[in-house]
Design a protein with these regions (language model features):
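Juxtamembrane intracellular "pre-TM" segments in multi-pass secondary transporters
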Residues: 2-33
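Pair of pore-lining "gating" transmembrane helices in MFS-fold secondary transporters
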Residues: 27-48, 130
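Short amphipathic helix-loop junctions that connect adjacent transmembrane helices
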Residues: 50-67
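Helix-terminus/helix-capping segments at the ends of transmembrane helices and short amphipathic helices
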Residues: 53, 57, 144-152
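Helix-to-loop junctions at the C-terminal end of transmembrane segments
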Residues: 80-99
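C-terminal transmembrane helical hairpin of 12-TM major facilitator-type secondary transporters
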Residues: 96-146
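A late C-terminal transmembrane helix in Major Facilitator Superfamily
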Residues: 153-171
């Protein structure tokens, strides 16, 4: 791979310079708007994921059922969502994909309302989790593409680390 700049000579150069570079590329208002978007885009999914296990237990699913159904129903839909998301982004563009996938992430969370009304049904649990994680995969593909677009080639590793850490804060 082509190296665009020499490696940083110090920790300050590795962290502070990429941070400053991000704000120097745009004025403070747009830079803060981009950072706010990064912090908020996955907020709903992060909160739903954090509350999922306590919700399943309250719904009277056993830990074994949660482990078997929830974990298996999440893996493949999230992988498929990520791959499908990448293909769709190439086809329709990143900005449209961010909106569409954000809406999908929002609507799939309502599957928990269906599950709550249906009661402890393992099939509905699997369908709800699969739908949510398909949306998670789509949204994550768009989000990663967005932060990659916003990162500078001169400081890509540090900026990607900072941006993903910012998005993970609500967890």
């Amino acid at each position: 791979p082509k190296q665009y700049a020499p490696p940083p000579a110090s920790l300050r150069e590795a962290v502070q310079v990429p941070f400053q570079e991000f704000f120097q590329r745009r004025s403070i208002g747009p830079a803060l708007a981009v950072l706010a978007f990064m912090a908020l885009y996955k907020l709903g999914d992060n909160m739903a994921t954090a509350l999922a296990s306590p919700f399943y237990l309250e719904m009277q699913f056993t830990p074994t059922q949660i482990g078997l159904v929830a974990k298996h129903a999440a893996l493949w839909p999230s992988i498929i969502g990520g791959l499908l998301g990448a293909l769709i982004i190439v086809k329709i563009g990143l900005n449209r994909a961010l909106w569409i996938f954000g809406f999908i992430q929002l609507t799939t969370i309502f599957g928990y309302v269906w599950l709550s009304n249906a009661g402890p049904d393992l099939v509905i649990l699997a369908v709800v989790i699969a739908g949510e994680y398909l949306g998670v995969g789509l949204g994550t593909a768009a989000f990663i593409a967005f932060i990659a677009r916003e990162a500078s080639r001169l400081a890509v590793a540090t900026q990607l680390a900072m941006f993903t850490a910012l998005a993970a804060l609500p967890r």
